[in-house]
Each structure stands twice: as C-alpha cells, then as structure tokens.
Amino acid sequence: MAEAATGFLEQLKSCIVWSWTYLWTVWFFIVLFLVYILRVPLKINDNLSTVSMFLNTLTPKFYVALTGTSSLISGLILIFEWWYFRKYGTSFIEQVSVSHLRPLLGGVDNNSSNNSNSSNGDSDSNRQSVSECKVWRNPLNLFRGAEYNRYTWVTGREPLTYYDMNLSAQDHQTFFTCDSDHLRPADAIMQKAWRERNPQARISAAHEALEINEIRSRVEVPLIASSTIWEIKLLPKCATAYILLAEEEATTIAEAEKLFKQALKAGDGCYRRSQQLQHHGSQYEAQHRRDTNVLVYIKRRLAMCARRLGRTREAVKMMRDLMKEFPLLSMFNIHENLLEALLELQAYADVQAVLAKYDDISLPKSATICYTAALLKARAVSDKFSPEAASRRGLSTAEMNAVEAIHRAVEFNPHVPKYLLEMKSLILPPEHILKRGDSEAIAYAFFHLAHWKRVEGALNLLHCTWEGTFRMIPYPLEKGHLFYPYPICTETADRELLPSFHEVSVYPKKELPFFILFTAGLCSFTAMLALLTHQFPELMGVFAKAMIDIFCSAEFRHWNCKSIFMRVEDELEIPPAPQSQHFQN
C-alpha cells in the first residue's frame, strides 16, 4: 500500500513538473489574447502611431548621440571586464552566466546525474590533484644564515616569504619536538624557540638551551662519616639547539658544519638511548621517532655541507650510508641530493642506477627525476644532433627516445626549460616547493643548470624540442598525455612561496575570453561609425543605403568591395577624373 502511494506521488510530481515546463506557452497566448481584447480601451493603435511619428521626427544627431552613448557604456564594460579578468583570472559575465543563469535554465540538474555517476571514477584523479597541489620541503634548500642572509646583506632583498618561513617553522615543530619535551628544560625551551617569529629570539633561546645543559648537577656521596665528596655529572647536550644555530647563526658553511658535528654527537647519543627504551610505552616511542628525525636531518645537512665545500665524494658516501641506515624515511627525499652530487662527479652510470630505483610509476615524480632522465638520454645523442640533418633524414631511435624524455619532463614541469635556457633569470630557491610549479623549476635549475651545460649539445636539443610538448597537450588543464592534467592551484601557491620581486611563471598562459575581445571590437567599430557619421553624414548615409541594397539583392555573392564603391560613386554622381595632360594630342 505504501509503495502504491509513493508511486502515485511520484507520478503526480512528474505531471506537475511537466505542466510547469510548458505552462509558459499558455501564459504567452493568454497575454496575446488580452492585448487583442483590450486594444481599443488601451488605445494601442494611437500609441503606435505616436511612437512612429516620434521616430520619424528624430534627427541624425540623436542617432549619433545614441551610438556614442552605447560606445561609452561598452567601453566601461570592457574596462571592468579587463580589470576583473586580471584580478580573478576569469570573465565576470561568463562566471555569472555559469553560476546563476545556467541553474535557472536547468543546466545543473542535467549535469548532476552525470557528476554523481562519474564521482567514483574521478576520485583517483581528484586525490592526485590534491597531492600535486601539496607543498613539499625543498630537498636542496639553502642555509639561512650562511646563504639566504648573505643575499639579504648584499642586495637588501628578502629571498624568503613569510608563508615559506611559517611552513618551515611547522616542519621544525613536527620533526624536532614531541609530547615529552616539557620534562627536559632544554627541550622545553627549544619547543618555544621553533615557534618564535623573530630570528634573534630563536637564536637567543638556542643559546639558553645550551647554557642549561652546561649546568653541572652535584650529587653528594658519603665516603666517611665526617667527609663527603661531590660527583660531577653532565646533562646530555641539546642537539636541536645546535641545529638552529647552524641553520641561522652560522655565517659560513664551514661554521655550520662545525655546529652540525656537535649536534651529531648529541643527537647520536639521544638516539641510542631512546632506541633502547622505545618499546616501553607510547611516550618513549614518540621520543625515539623524534630522535630519529633529528639524527637523519643532521646527517643529511652534514652531507650537504660537504657537497658545498667541494668534498663531493664524501658527500655521496654519507648520503648512501644514510639511505641504507634509514630506508623508510623518504620524506627528506635524500635521493635527489644524491642525484645532484653524482651528476657533479659525472658518474652517469650511478645516476642511471638511482633513477631505475626511484623513477617508478608508483612513486611521486619530481622535476629532478624527470629532467635527470631526459638529460641522460639527451647525453647519448646531443653531441651529434643537428635540427637540419634531423629534418632531412628523420630522427633515429636514440634521438626519438631523447625527444620523448624531454617531452615527458616538460609535461611534468613546463617552467624548467625557460630557466635552463636562461630565458628567465634565476633567484634563490625557496625552502618549500610546489611540484610542477614555478618554485620547483627554480629549485631544480638553480642546482642543475651547470650539469646541463656540461653535457655538450644538451641545451641545444632541449631548445629545439621542448615547445613541441604543447602540441601534444592542447588543453593541459583538462587532459594530460603521460601525467594527470596540470593542476590549477600552482600559480596561487607559487605566489605565496616566491618573493614579490620575482615574476611568477604562469602555465598555461591565460588568454582573454572571447567576450572581452568581442566587446572591444564592437566598441571600437561603433565608435568609428559614430565619428564618421558625425563628420560626413551625407556620405555615410549614401554608403549605408548602398550596403543595404547590396545585402538585400539576390546577387550579393557576386559583389565585391569594388562593386560597393562603384555603387557609392553612382549614388554621389562623382564625375570621372580629368584626363592627364600628358596624353592629350
């Protein structure tokens, strides 16, 4: 019974919806019928005669003024549309049409079923889009005190944004703190230091934490009833305090390396103690996880110090040992540091071995992986590559593989080639990057430009082939070729990560909507007609009459511009030009 009632209600609802769909036609005919019935009381014929008389008495100046007013309004609309597009990246009228007019016309109802049906199929791509818009820690980030601050002293510009430094503060609190820090005075001070915005306050807090560790605890041990002896015991050092001083206070890489070595001694001792106690409870497990992060960070930065100071082989050994000791800590992306160091040594076979392990479909990609793979394939053919010869004989198999690798890399991050080809100036890379964005391109090119220059002909091959990628993906925001569609969020995130004096690279280039171009053309054409009509009213009237006659004629397709001007000359009765005196007898 209930099912029958439900079915009846559904049928009644569908009938009402159907009736409202076609009810407007009934109302239209009713209005026409009322107008016809009331034509005499409303004096419709008299009103129409008055309107026609008014239109006949209008002078051409009125139409010129009307045209000029419409041109002015069109110009104001154009200026507003251009401002709205520059600020928000979309057309105001198109947005209003899609957001407000389309639901009124039933567009949302038609698409809602399709969206609900395809929601499960698009869930993977949505998750991928969110992951691609995630901000990552730059594995090759510079030292604040020894590199970023020196740049500020020389140029007076701040290379890091507040948003970037705030993300670093959050990373430090995640990696270097735990819930049991309040039990140790030095760690409690450092927990507050990582939250400080003022660099001097952070440095002062780090020194305070080290001074607390220098306090010696004295324990009385009675040896004889009449005498005592004082046993001196040192508290463990605070490794995170040394990390902060090495990152922000040290003005050279050598000073930073000394502080990191002191941090390594303290961090290694804390790591060994917490490793023995990690199974005694969740508190000890969290402390061991924190000590592991501290130790890995210190060793990685020591390897980067060795790389900066020219001890590249030592840096490679330290990175390999670190990856063997902690294979599961992929959050630091140490393999990207290793790839850069191996390229500096020109150990291309080792680079290929690392790529074979990390250039996997199940692992997240990066510009370092994609462009390093392209560099290795370009290295095999770049020294003999010639675009003229390739156009004559075609590409060989090796050249085709190199071109495909370049296209793959450019599709992943299309901003990198402009920096490698020095079409855009480089700046210091930020501490955080957005994969496939301009920030990642800067971070990659800053360290790898020298490696591309070292391979003969590699930049030439890149210059000849990188733009061909865009022909394969004409709509990169909707569909990709080898990767997911290019994320829309990169421009906004890069503007937050990169300093204001840098011009952020935007992909794909935003083109003006058709409505803005159409409005601009219509406004210009109308204004030109108004000006010509005001200056030459008789000529424009004759020209308009000739155009109307031509458009109304059945032989319009046989007319051309010459025929139009001949018709205008006939209307104006322009006499023929006098014959030149040189041809008179």
Swiss-Prot record:
Listed transmembrane segments: 15-35, 62-82, 512-532
UniProt-annotated location(s): Membrane
Presence of the UniProt keyword Metal-binding in the record: no
Pfam families with a match to the protein in the record: ST7
Keyword Glycoprotein: yes
Annotated GO CC locations: membrane
InterPro entries on file: ST7
PANTHER family (alphabetical): SUPPRESSION OF TUMORIGENICITY 7, SUPPRESSOR OF TUMORIGENICITY 7 PROTEIN
Designated name of the protein: Suppressor of tumorigenicity 7 protein
Gene designation: ST7
